[in-house]
Amino acid sequence: MTLIVTGAAGFIGANLVKALNERGETRIIAVDNLTRADKFKNLVDCEIDDYLDKTEFVERFARGDFGKVRAVFHEGACSDTMETDGRYMMDNNFRYSRAVLDACLAQGAQFLYASSAAIYGGSSRFVEEREVEAPLNVYGYSKFLFDQVIRRVMPGAKSQIAGFRYFNVYGPRESHKGRMASVAFHNFNQFRAEGKVKLFGEYSGYGPGEQTRDFVSVEDVAKVNLYFFDHPEKSGIFNLGTGRAQPFNDIAATVVNTLRALEGQPALTLAEQVEQGLVEYVPFPDALRGKYQCFTQADQTKLRAAGYDAPFLTVQEGVDRYVRWLFGQL
């Protein structure tokens, strides 16, 4: 049976295509918008059965052009949290997602989709409950609104619906994202270009570089998606993060030490990196005040209750692996 991945040339989508290939799955329809043409590079080492532009996909899927579809991994979205065009965001992230969902329900296909931790906004609790959901931007709202649709539809659905609230994802195949790429990606490039990594200074009660996030490797994101793909009886909305909040300082220190190790130099403590000017703190930008999550940490209770019991990579493990991969691409 056919599998469909939307956003297939994007960051998480391409990693899912690759992970499916590694399991022997090649009957995959890749759906994306290649207006940004350089994204094609993410699929060069992947095997797919067909490619469709997102503008023609939904109509063809809805009328059954692809025969029996087992599952749709819906990763396609505008993920730019600084996007201010609300009409574009809602059309792209909300209405388009509803159309894909409707087609899946009509055909009995598994629907596994990308939600986001941006739904929680400035909340200090990160559980999959309506009362703690308060997005700070229109991106978060587009994801929030779709999750509300899912909550209404899920009780009557005859096929799987699984949504994943991705926390701060990093890893291979994200270079096309530009400013929206992960902190690890930007730290890597900045250190190579300038010989130092810059982090935000003090803000909202957090010391320099001590704003904390739940940083999750795209390797783990793919594994969780595939777990639910293998268990179509399990539906729900699930946080997808490590369950650990780690400061940006941990990312920077790991990037610096991994690059030093690749050059045969010894590891340094964060304090030593700061003292030597390898990590530098800059004033927090006014444009982000009031719109910035200083703390995120996935509550994994629902995910673990659904049977996913594999450990998640720490920042030190995952970022080290990622930096070595980036270095190997040079």
Curated annotation (Swiss-Prot):
Its EC number is 5.1.3.20. Binds 1 NADP(+) per subunit. NCBIfam families: heptose_epim. It catalyses: ADP-D-glycero-beta-D-manno-heptose = ADP-L-glycero-beta-D-manno-heptose. Catalyzes the interconversion between ADP-D-glycero-beta-D-manno-heptose and ADP-L-glycero-beta-D-manno-heptose via an epimerization at carbon 6 of the heptose. This is ADP-L-glycero-D-manno-heptose-6-epimerase. The gene is hldD. Substrate binds at N168, R179, H186, F200, G201, E202, Y203, R213, Y292. Its cofactor is NADP(+). The keyword Cytoplasm does not apply. Pathway: Nucleotide-sugar biosynthesis; ADP-L-glycero-beta-D-manno-heptose biosynthesis; ADP-L-glycero-beta-D-manno-heptose from D-glycero-beta-D-manno-heptose 7-phosphate: step 4/4. GO terms for molecular function: ADP-glyceromanno-heptose 6-epimerase activity; NADP binding. The lineage of its organism: Bacteria, Pseudomonadati, Pseudomonadota, Betaproteobacteria, Burkholderiales. SUPFAM superfamilies: NAD(P)-binding Rossmann-fold domains. Keywords: Carbohydrate metabolism, Isomerase, NADP. Homopentamer. PANTHER family: ADP-L-GLYCERO-D-MANNO-HEPTOSE-6-EPIMERASE, NUCLEOSIDE-DIPHOSPHATE-SUGAR EPIMERASE. Contains a large N-terminal NADP-binding domain, and a smaller C-terminal substrate-binding domain. Belongs to the NAD(P)-dependent epimerase/dehydratase family. HldD subfamily. NADP(+) binds at residues 11-12, 32-33, 39, 54, 75-79, 92, 143, 169, 177. The active site is at Y139, K177. GO terms for biological process: ADP-L-glycero-beta-D-manno-heptose biosynthetic process; carbohydrate metabolic process.
